[in-house]
Amino acid sequence: MAKLTKRMRVIREKVDGTKLYEINDAVALLKELATAKFVESVDVAVNLGIDPRKSDQNVRGATVLPHGTGRDVRVAVFTQGANAEAAKAAGAELVGMDDLAEKIKAGEMNFDVVIASPDAMRVVGMLGQILGPRGLMPNPKTGTVTPNVAEAVKNAKAGQVRYRNDKNGIIHTTIGKVDFTPVQLKENLEALISALKKAKPAVAKGVYVKKVSISTTMGAGVAVDQASLETAN
């Protein structure tokens, strides 16, 4: 506990919770404070001006970050025929239909993303209680239910992030690793914010992107001055 206490004391001394940091300063601060013995992820929380209680104001989707996430993503694909061969060629680790469903029912969950062609949803639908709670259920809004499974596999491998607001209207996702360059993290964040703005519900009123904070896995949040991002306008 002593190490954690010391770490948190340093964070409190370094991070001004009332300040908006220019993006490069924010990234530099995260890198300075990232002292864990592993390469920490850089996470982002975006507070949106939506009413999450209303279904027509919920924001959900996916976007490919220009510099990826720094993670090796394992992909499972439910499809058959020519699509199965295309999915394998695109790099999917697991491809199948009922046989893949049986593996998952037996507890084989060695994957990070599940993709399905529309004709496979009859099989995937029976796995809702297993995949749903883990956030793995394929959905057309995130591009994981698609006739072009090969492209979806390539996107997942290239660093696609899926996003969905929580009950407080906040989007939580990752934009890379702490060993990314400042430019890579900035451009990944800008790509995410741009995607969120394109996904703005038509009925949302007032300021849409209210607050943007970045943090490392073990660190505190640092509020980013949106004027320092290319998506400011």
Swiss-Prot record:
Claim: Ribosomal protein is one of the keywords in the record: yes
SUPFAM superfamilies noted in UniProt: Ribosomal protein L1
GO molecular function: rRNA binding; structural constituent of ribosome; tRNA binding
Record-level GO BP terms: regulation of translation; translation
UniProt entry tagged with the keyword Iron: no
Recorded GO CC terms: cytosolic large ribosomal subunit
Domain of life: Bacteria
PROSITE patterns the UniProt entry points to: RIBOSOMAL_L1
Keywords: Repressor, Ribonucleoprotein, Ribosomal protein, RNA-binding, rRNA-binding, Translation regulation, tRNA-binding
Annotated function: Binds directly to 23S rRNA. The L1 stalk is quite mobile in the ribosome, and is involved in E site tRNA release. Protein L1 is also a translational repressor protein, it controls the translation of the L11 operon by binding to its mRNA.
Stated family: Belongs to the universal ribosomal protein uL1 family.
Subunit structure: Part of the 50S ribosomal subunit.
Protein name, UniProt field: Large ribosomal subunit protein uL1
